[in-house]
Amino acid sequence: EPLYEKCRLQKKPVTVMFIDADHLKYINDTFGHDMGNLEIRGIADGIRKVFPPEAVSMRYGGDEFVVLLPGCEKAQAESLKAAFLKALDEISKSLHAEFDVEASIGYEVVLCGEKSLNECINNADEKMYQFKKARKAQRE
């Protein structure tokens, strides 16, 4: 939250990314919790690999992550989202597991701190669910 407040005071844009591990319950139930942990670690590795050093990332829930990106506007956020999803594909291939490391991602770009951090997280979460739903429909 201090980073978010700093961006608000400096009137800088900030992007809040919400990332959800896909199929974690299925992976845990089918392959065991060690494999579920492998998916979580794969997502964390993707975050470290793709997002810039000034980004602040945190595990938000059992299978969710939030990443704050100071000074990040929409075009850069879209580029980082694509790079993150590509990184997960590469991580999946390197693991040779019986499942793919996949995540759904949504983001909210806020200019001049016009919303609270909680509002941004909730909006990014909603956009993540829209992404998840659209990808599921595309695969069917």
What are these regions (language model features)?
Residues 50-53, 92-94:
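Preference for short coil/turn "hinge" residues that link or interrupt alpha-helices
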Residues 1-16, 22-52, 58-62, 66-67, ...:
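Conserved long alpha-helical elements within nucleotide-processing catalytic cores of c-di-GMP signaling
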Residues 29, 78-85, 89, 93-96, ...:
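Catalytic-core segments of nucleotide cyclases and related cyclic-nucleotide turnover enzymes
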Residues 26, 67, 88-89, 107:
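A near-ubiquitous, low-amplitude feature marking generic local secondary-structure context
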Residues 99-104:
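PAS and PAS-like sensory/regulatory domains
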Residues 21, 71, 105:
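Residues immediately flanking
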Residues 67-72, 109-111:
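Short beta-strand-to-loop capping motifs
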